[in-house]
């Protein structure tokens, strides 16, 4: 193309300069895609049927005036809360009429466009509903459905776990539930201020009922923390029940659409049947039956952790799309005098900033789907479990243990990764990334709570590391372990493995590299653990000494899981037309991950210094390859401009026009003087000069 060409081209009915206008650049970039974008979308969505259903739901959301987001970024807390409640009320209508899978799709899409509404719904359906379904009997579940829990009719549930004084240490919660044999009731109490339920989403304004995590005390014996359903408000007038105190915890960093509150209980009596008794049972005489595994009582927590891995992909794909579309139309500087400025996507360093993140977002999808399938299978087994089925119970216990470990590590590292994606893509968009209208600031403030709630990421990571050491100990005893750590069975073969001239673009070699690193870290930590036990420490003390090793083990094991799941999904499900483009992303992700942690592979002896140079060259190579098709990769996410909700990331590439229009629509020109002109600005500018205001310069 002639760089001095000033002709025009028509795109979607508009004329643009053939070289300098952003929509032309976007059209050119889109034309570079060599693979069928639609097929890639089907792959990501799990099939054409799912894509068509997603598109139907997206269109319904976009066309509903209640979900208009034109002024979303300018709303205050009170306005957001009211709008969120209106949207929840509308979405509840679909719950009554649609299949569960369609409802999940609708909620997931809402989570991209409006995290507050998604969470306010999730508090009831994910946490309250999940707890009743997961830890209540079939009869109890049916009872609460009949009361309106299914379709939010005269009923709204919340989840009272966290306390002012305890969060991560679930076993340390202090709210009490004392059984009164005379009345066949539990008495719920908040014994002191630190036991106040805190951060409870939905409590401040909305919830009529809650699942309370409280200490089960029968005949003076403490049986640990169990779950109870407690009514908070009277149904007819929404006033508080006797003994219930509730307040609003006020301004938060983000997610203002959620009415987080605090709750205190003072001698609140509930029927014995309100203890959720799928696993822990208390009969009329006060006889207590405990489950074989405490985690069975907390199965509802897994729901949130698994969904957050999927959420990380959903939100991450929105922001990597914005940054890459912007990079394809934004021009800055010129590497050749007299030539037009260069697209920032063509700068190698900018490619390195963004393209590994694109690969990471794809990797999150593969692993989240895999763990989601494991979760669904496990929950079905739990639902079908009969009280006298000991073999089935043992199988469920084994599955739950594995799911707790896998979901803990994945929740931690995926939510951290998404936070990183949001912030790094913001920085990659320069000053315009700082504008509220491009969504980064709001999304980051809304997102980062994911790194804390339902398990602080650092604590979850240590928990996952502990489980890995326990698995290694079990293997040494000849006991079975879960599929997620089955590679540890080959540890002796892997311990001293090296690259030895093999190709670093072979997926099997790359997965092996991570298995060697993870296996070595886990087994060294296990050696240290057994040594500490031999020296007289108990298990908790030994694990505490090994905190850093546990964290590192979980980190490397989880990255290995992400990489292996990515390659496996490509191998088993990708069609020929999209297989190589997906492999390019998977190879970029695996190699970049090695480069980011190169010292680890040198220490473990799998790679030599010269191999690290090769890794860097390959990362550069795959960045160059992936760069050519970035618009195809991001178009495959199939997000409309409504869900992107950032003018610099619009589909047609006309970023500056959309951005300028957005700013002016939300900030229309009025009196050029500010509202405080008369009261503050004018007196300041026209204040009378006093002697003290005059600066006299010394003359030499």
Swiss-Prot record:
InterPro entries: ACOX_C_alpha1, Acyl-CoA_ox_N, Acyl-CoA_Oxase/DH_mid-dom, Acyl-CoA_Oxase/DH_mid-dom_sf, Acyl-CoA_oxidase, Acyl-CoA_oxidase_C, AcylCo_DH-like_C, AcylCoA_DH/ox_N_sf
Broad EC category: oxidoreductase
SUPFAM superfamilies: Acyl-CoA dehydrogenase C-terminal domain-like, Acyl-CoA dehydrogenase NM domain-like
GO cellular component, one term: peroxisome
UniProt EC number: 1.3.3.6
Assembly mode: Heteropentamer composed of five different subunits.
Protein function: Oxidizes strain chain acyl-CoAs with a chain length of 10 to 14 carbons. Also active toward the 2S isomers of acyl-CoA-esters containing a 2-methyl group.
Family membership noted in the UniProt record: Belongs to the acyl-CoA oxidase family.
Protein name (database record): Acyl-coenzyme A oxidase 2
Organism: Yarrowia lipolytica (strain CLIB 122 / E 150) (Yeast)
